[in-house]
Swiss-Prot record:
Superkingdom assignment: Eukaryota
Chain's role: Acts as a transcription factor. May play a role in neuronal differentiation.
Keywords tagged on the record: Developmental protein, DNA-binding, Homeobox, Neurogenesis, Nucleus, Transcription, Transcription regulation
Protein name: POU domain, class 3, transcription factor 1-B
Subcellular location: Nucleus
Species of the source: Xenopus laevis (African clawed frog)
Family to which this protein belongs: Belongs to the POU transcription factor family. Class-3 subfamily.
Gene3D superfamilies the record matches: Homeodomain-like, lambda repressor-like DNA-binding domains
Domain POU-specific: 194-268
Compositional bias (Basic and acidic residues): 162-178
Amino acid sequence: MAATAQYLPRNNSLPSNPLMHPDSDRMHQGTTYREVQKMMHQEYLQGLATNAGHPMSLTHHQWLPNPTSDWGSGSHLGAQAEHGKSGVQSSREDLSSSFHHHRSHLVHQQTPSSHAWAQSGGHHLPSMSPGSNSHQPLIYSQSSYTNLNGMLGPQASSLHHSMRDPLHDDPGVHDTHVESPPQHLGHHQDHSDEDAPSSDDLEQFAKQFKQRRIKLGFTQADVGLALGTLYGNVFSQTTICRFEALQLSFKNMCKLKPLLNKWLEETDSTTGSPTNLDKIAAQGRKRKKRTSIEVGVKGALENHFLKCPKPSAHEITSLADSLQLEKEVVRVWFCNRRQKEKRMTPAGVPHPPMEDVYSQAETPPLHHTLQTSVQ
């Protein structure tokens, strides 16, 4: 029993290589193994007496050596051992040659390597005799499949199930089903690419749009506000300018193109009626007309500016009433006049006080004096 306990840990090393030759140095070390051989040989003789002619007992005990020799002295035992070695070697060669094939060949076709391995695995299963240890066959049978999965690589689990039932799963159909969605997705992508305009089409449309817009007499700001009134999307003058100059992104160009195309169609349909054109033009920015001031009115404003270049709000109101002008027009005129005076005065020349310069109406302004001195 002590020898059996010593043998069991060594038997745990068998799953690392179930096809290892019995003469390997890894399994034969020390005199303890010789004692185990003697004990196992005695069990073998008892097994022959109890299970005479049983194939599983013979195949199981073909690995047990004779105390006088390594492989036993019986003719039937030697022939069985030679047959086991040749079967193991042939299965090893067949298995190594089948590793280079595709995984689908191993699943769809029952190659000789799989049959040889199944047979060799069956020969290695020990007999379940009442006197033998029940834990040993479980460990040994599991190790053969464990090492098979390890030698076959990362896909060993699927291959192992396929060897038990070849019709369990069809990897070819599975691979086709997995690869089909990307093809379907690519079909939708091609369809969307066909709908999107090309860069040449966008460039040609931007050129035609600019020509037709100028011909119709609309500014870029008018087009942006008209799009907001007609379709609810207000665009700035900068956006329309960048579209015509092809400075927007391709995505924004594609979004803006159909809106501008609809606006052109709407404008072309109303070309014959000036009323509709006036409505579309009125959708643009409302800009005040430039006010033209008469010569006599401009002289009166100039005289008042010489007296007081920055009048108060009350003075502007009274001056606008006397000249029959709008209050805003008078205010803007004085602002522009002060800016003009500031531009015409050199920066290096000190600016005299306004009271001294404009104390007398007959005295010309400072810039007239400077121009006379320079001449």
